[in-house]
Amino acid sequence: EREIYVYGTNIYELYEKVFLGNEDEMDSIDLLQKLKEKDSDNPILDEKFSDIILIFDYDPQDNRYSEERIKLMLDYFSESTENGKLYINYPMLESYKHFKSFPDEEYIKRKVDFELVKKGKYKEIVGKEAKITKINKFTKDVFNEIIISNIKKANYITSNLEDLKSIKEIYN
């Protein structure tokens, strides 16, 4: 059975809660205990977990943004069965719907100026450009196309390969 706990804030708040002032005690940090300090009445935090998955937006527009903090958290939260596994939506969750048409052949190579993201303008850009906006209206085919497009985009960013055949070749 899977249970989801929503932390309800951003990655930099997590950093401050878990790591700030605890740099010398990183081997003994108890994530669930830190979460209980914020939300002591939530019974899910008393459960035992086989895996902990942390999903946050990158949020470079936050005034607490720091590449060093991101690197520290990625290093620390690197295994779901130990300290937890951190996944970061880049630049934020809204990126999944940044399709100007559907399907959108340019999606894989679409870039946004990082300075605009840091200024908090990305959501506005997606709001103006996105062809798909309401997640509750998505069909299975639309979800599949979004997933395939994002796999292709990740493959293009990391390996400069544009097709799924290339992805399969990497893993064979």
Residue ranges and their predicted role:
Residues 31:
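A surface-exposed, charged beta-strand/loop segment in the N-terminal or early-internal portion
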Residues 28:
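N-terminal carbohydrate-binding/catalytic regions of secreted carbohydrate-active enzymes
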